[in-house]
Amino acid sequence: NLRAIPNQDGTNSGVFVVLSLDRGLVIIGGTHYAGEIKKAIFTIMNHILPAKGLLPMHCSANTDGANSALFFGLSGTGKTTLSADPERALVGDDEHGWSDEGVFNFEGGCYAKLINLSKKDEPAIFATTMMRGTILENVVLNADGTPDFTNDSLTQNTRGSYPIESIENRTSNSMAGNPKNVVFLTCDCLLYTSDAADETGR
C-alpha cells in the first residue's frame, strides 16, 4: 500500500494523485477509490480536448432519439440514476464530450454509486450488480455472500463498475445529438439546495 509521507512529500495526507502532462504520467497512491484512475484521465482530457474543438463534461446523458439531455452534478446527486430512465436510451453515466455533431460517451461503462441501492427504485442499476463483468467496490457482503448495499462501514462511496452493455436501454454507439435539455443537480443527500442554484439571487 503505497502512501505519501505528508511532511516529506508536501501532501495533505497519505493519499496522493500526481499528474504530469508533459510526461503523460499519473501516479496514484494511498487510496482504495478506483475512481481516481478515471478522474486522472479525465483531467488530462480536459487539458487536451478543448484545443480540438471538443468540450469534456462531467455529466450523464440520455436520449429519446430526438431530444438528448445532460445531467450535471457532484458525486451522489443522481446523475447515474436519472440517466438510467427506462423511457430513454442511456448514452453514458459520467464522462462525455460535446462536439458540433452532438454528445458522446468517453468510457464504455458505468461507475454507479451503490449506497442504499434498491431494486424497487433503481431496477436497471440493481440488475447490473448481479451480472458477469460487474465489479463491486468497497461493498460489504453478508454472510451468505450477497451484497449489503445499506452497509457504509467501509465508506459511503461504495461503487459498481459495469460495462455499458449491461444496461439494456442504451444507444448503440454511445452517441446522441446536440442536447435540448441541460439539468444541473444541486441538492445534496439531505435535499438542501445550494445558494448558488438560484439564478435570481433570492
Per-range role (PLM):
Residues Y192-G201:
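Single conserved hydrophobic/aromatic residue that forms the stacking wall/gate
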Residues S99-T150:
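Conserved nucleotide-sensing/catalytic segment adjacent to the nucleotide-binding pocket
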Residues V139-C187:
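Glycine-rich phosphate-binding loop used to anchor ATP phosphates in small-molecule kinases
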Residues K38-P56:
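N-terminal pre-Walker A segment at the start of P-loop NTPase domains
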Residues G53-L55, C59-A66:
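Phosphate-binding P-loop
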Residues N1-V26:
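Long, basic/Gly/Ser/Thr-rich N-terminal segments
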Residues A66-A89:
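Glycine-rich phosphate-binding P-loop
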